[in-house]
Amino acid sequence: MPSETMTIAFELAAIQQTREPQAVIVEARRWAQSVGLITADAGAAHTFSSENLVRRDFQVMPTTSNVQHLRNQFTTERHVLIGEALDRPDYLPQHHWEYFVLADAASAAGWDLENTETSPRKQFSSWLARVFRSCV
C-alpha cells in the first residue's frame, strides 16, 4: 500500500544508473504516493520509460519553478529528489525538498547500481561508436 506522505522524484541520469530501474520504481511506489522523473530531455525520458516499463506520475524539467509546482501539485508531507550529483542541485529549493545522492539511496534501499564500465548496453554503445568513427 503506497504511503500518502511522500513524493519521490528521480533525476533521469540517476535512475538510468540502476541495474533494474523498473524494480527500483516499483519499490519506490511502496513508499511514496507519487513517483516521477526530472530531466531536460523529454524524449530520453519517454524512451527510458518505454524500454524499462516504468510508469511515472510526472515528468518535469529541472527548474526551480517546476519543482515548486510539483510540491503544490502533490501535497505530501515529504518531497524527495534522488540524483547523481554529490551536491544538492541548484534548481532544488532549500525548503520542503530533501536530496539524496543515488549511491546513498541505493545502499540504504538495497538497489544494485550498474557497473558503467561493464554494462552490456555501455559496451555495445562503445563498440557502435567505434564502428561509426572508423567509417568516417
Residue ranges of model-derived segments:
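Asp-based, Mg2+/Mn2+-dependent phosphohydrolase catalytic module
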Residues: 1-32, 68-78, 85-136
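Substrate-recognition "cap/lid" segment bordering the active-site pocket of phosphatases
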Residues: 40-79
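Structural recognition of the conserved hydrophobic beta-strand(s) that form the central parallel beta-sheet
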Residues: 34-39
